[in-house]
């Protein structure tokens, strides 16, 4: 995956990292193309081999329950289809790129969830930002910038909710977290959006997983009103 360094997304990244009343918020908004790096190719080969082994076991299995679980219950679609496996690989590669000190290659497709509606995801992020005192950002800037780069209405959205042992912030007094992947197949782009609430004593981390105490620059309070109003949210899944 190739990380796209864009000034407006950097602004969103900065705005999503701040101190709330009872915790520190560490957010990410990162855009990647699906162009494979050498490490991605190794990862894809390993995942593909694992999936092929599962498919071989399926062909040898007489259990209809096992057959159903492999071909129907993946959030990415039937895993006997290469397009489904490829989407899963892109998401794992995105996590590896975003957190290079962690290895997510052992994740399974069932560790993820396909969100049924874009509006529900937007509402969830907006509600979280409202609750922690950054509600204006969600309406006046974030979604407009994201949509500009990935065309939200054309995206499939997946979520990842790991346990504390698997979460990259699990050792950092993690209180809560949310992670979403917006995949636009036609544009060959993946956007990773996450918010994590950490205990007050924990320092921030930059996108490379290192300590980062830099001061964030929030989106301006007097920014132009966004087109992404309540009506837009209500109709985005049409």
From Swiss-Prot:
Family matches, as InterPro entries: Maf1, Maf1_sf
GO MF term (any one): RNA polymerase III core binding
Pfam families referenced in this protein's UniProt entry, alphabetically: Maf1
One BP annotation, GO: negative regulation of transcription by RNA polymerase III
Swiss-Prot/TrEMBL keywords: Cytoplasm, Nucleus, Repressor, Transcription, Transcription regulation
Recorded GO CC terms: cytoplasm; nucleus
Superkingdom, taxonomy of origin: Eukaryota
Amino acid composition bias (Acidic residues), ranges on this chain: 221-238
Keyword Transcription regulation: yes
Compartments where located: Cytoplasm; Nucleus
Family: Belongs to the MAF1 family.
The protein's assembly and partners: Interacts with TFIIIB subunit brf1 and RNA polymerase III subunit rpc82.
The protein's role, per its UniProt record: Mediator of diverse signals that repress RNA polymerase III transcription. Inhibits the de novo assembly of TFIIIB onto DNA.
Annotated protein name in UniProt: Repressor of RNA polymerase III transcription maf1
Organism the protein comes from: Schizosaccharomyces pombe (strain 972 / ATCC 24843)
């Amino acid at each position: 995956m190739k990380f796209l360094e864009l000034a407006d997304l950097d602004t969103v990244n900065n705005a999503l990292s701040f101190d709330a009343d009872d915790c520190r918020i560490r957010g990410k908004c990162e855009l990647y193309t699906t162009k494979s790096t050498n490490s991605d190719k190794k990862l894809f080969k390993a995942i593909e081999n694992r999936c092929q082994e599962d498919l071989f076991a399926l062909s040898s299995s007489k259990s209809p329950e096992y057959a159903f679980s492999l071909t129907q219950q993946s959030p990415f679609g039937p895993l006997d289809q290469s397009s489904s496996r490829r989407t899963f690989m892109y998401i794992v590669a995105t996590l590896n790129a975003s957190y290079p000190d962690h290895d997510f290659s052992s994740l399974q497709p069932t560790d993820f969830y396909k969100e049924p509606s874009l509006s529900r995801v937007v509402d969830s992020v907006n509600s979280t930002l409202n609750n922690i005192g950054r509600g204006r950002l969600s309406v006046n800037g974030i979604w407009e910038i994201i949509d500009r780069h990935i065309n939200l209405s054309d995206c499939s959205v997946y979520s990842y909710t790991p346990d504390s042992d698997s979460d990259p912030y699990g050792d950092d007094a993690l209180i809560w977290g949310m992670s979403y992947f917006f995949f636009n197949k036609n544009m060959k782009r993946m956007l990773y959006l996450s918010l994590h609430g950490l205990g007050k004593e924990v320092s921030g981390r930059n996108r490379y997983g290192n300590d980062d105490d830099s001061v964030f620059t929030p989106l301006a309070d007097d920014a132009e009103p966004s087109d992404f109003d309540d009506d837009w949210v209500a109709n985005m899944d049409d």
